[in-house]
UniProtKB/Swiss-Prot annotation:
<dbReference type="GO" id="GO:0016226">
    <property type="term" value="P:iron-sulfur cluster assembly"/>
</dbReference>
<feature type="binding site">
    <location>
        <position position="151"/>
    </location>
    <ligand>
        <name>[4Fe-4S] cluster</name>
    </ligand>
</feature>
<keyword id="KW-0004">4Fe-4S</keyword>
<dbReference type="GO" id="GO:0005506">
    <property type="term" value="F:iron ion binding"/>
</dbReference>
<keyword id="KW-0408">Iron</keyword>
<dbReference type="GO" id="GO:0051604">
    <property type="term" value="P:protein maturation"/>
</dbReference>
<comment type="subunit">
    <text>Homodimer.</text>
</comment>
<protein>
    <recommendedName>
        <fullName>Fe/S biogenesis protein NfuA</fullName>
    </recommendedName>
</protein>
<dbReference type="InterPro" id="IPR035903">
    <property type="entry name" value="HesB-like_dom_sf"/>
</dbReference>
<feature type="binding site">
    <location>
        <position position="154"/>
    </location>
    <ligand>
        <name>[4Fe-4S] cluster</name>
    </ligand>
</feature>
<comment type="function">
    <text>Involved in iron-sulfur cluster biogenesis. Binds a 4Fe-4S cluster, can transfer this cluster to apoproteins, and thereby intervenes in the maturation of Fe/S proteins. Could also act as a scaffold/chaperone for damaged Fe/S proteins.</text>
</comment>
<dbReference type="InterPro" id="IPR001075">
    <property type="entry name" value="NIF_FeS_clus_asmbl_NifU_C"/>
</dbReference>
<comment type="similarity">
    <text>Belongs to the NfuA family.</text>
</comment>
<dbReference type="Pfam" id="PF01106">
    <property type="entry name" value="NifU"/>
</dbReference>
<dbReference type="InterPro" id="IPR017726">
    <property type="entry name" value="Fe/S_biogenesis_protein_NfuA"/>
</dbReference>
<keyword id="KW-0411">Iron-sulfur</keyword>
<dbReference type="GO" id="GO:0051539">
    <property type="term" value="F:4 iron, 4 sulfur cluster binding"/>
</dbReference>
Length: 199
């Protein structure tokens, strides 16, 4: 169920009335659901632009259309239009399921490692234009990773591996005993910090 505050409904209605298109509503969809970059998208929805499988939420004077593929990701979402302490107004969408839910301990070791890499480690590495990819997880709990982007060839990759990636995986995923780097760092085209760097 998606909750829409009265202030959000009033805000949408004003915007729709400005457009002056009969039957216009608002479409809500999830973009990149189940990933760390997931986001909710709101846009005007002209009746001729609808696919036909949208879920409809009657908001009184207009309809909110929810993309069918997004329904599960947006279940429990709240849409509000609030006045900030500064006096400015802001539309707020809270969608607690949009980025996915952490896997339980009954998930396989590989699934849990991949989840932590995608949802916790890669978002941090992205600030440097980097990422890691899981190559293999052995039955013994040794994780083999390959660095990419700004981490490929970076002079700090060893530190990132030991103090960041390995520590996070060993703390967060029961069963991981070691993390190894399978990257050939000599081939890195645009490292965040060159391996030749000396302060």
């Amino acid at each position: 169920m998606i909750q829409i505050s009265d202030t959000a409904k009033s805000h949408f209605l004003k915007l729709i009335q400005r457009e002056g298109v009969p039957g216009m509503g608002v479409r809500l969809s999830a973009v990149d659901p189940g990933t760390p970059r997931a986001d909710a998208r709101l846009e005007f929805a002209d009746p001729s632009e609808l696919v036909g499988d949208e879920w409809l939420i009657d908001c009184g004077d207009f309809t909110l259309y929810v993309a069918s593929a997004s329904v599960a990701w947006l279940d429990g979402a709240e849409i509000d239009y609030v006045t900030q302490a500064t006096g400015s107004q802001q539309l707020i969408i809270k969608a607690p399921k949009i980025k996915g839910q952490e896997l339980s301990q009954v998930a396989s070791l590989v699934e849990r490692v991949c989840w932590v890499v995608e949802n916790e480690i890669n978002p941090q590495l992205a600030s440097h234009g980097g990422r890691v990819e899981v190559q293999e997880v052995s039955a013994e709990g040794v994780v083999l990773l390959r660095f990419g982007g700004g981490c490929h060839g970076c002079g700090m990759a060893d530190v990132t591996l030991k103090q960041g990636v390995e520590k996070t995986l060993m703390d967060r995923v029961h069963g991981v005993i070691a993390v190894r780097d399978a990257t050939d760092h000599s081939t890195g085209a645009a490292p965040y910090i060159s391996r030749d760097f000396s302060p």
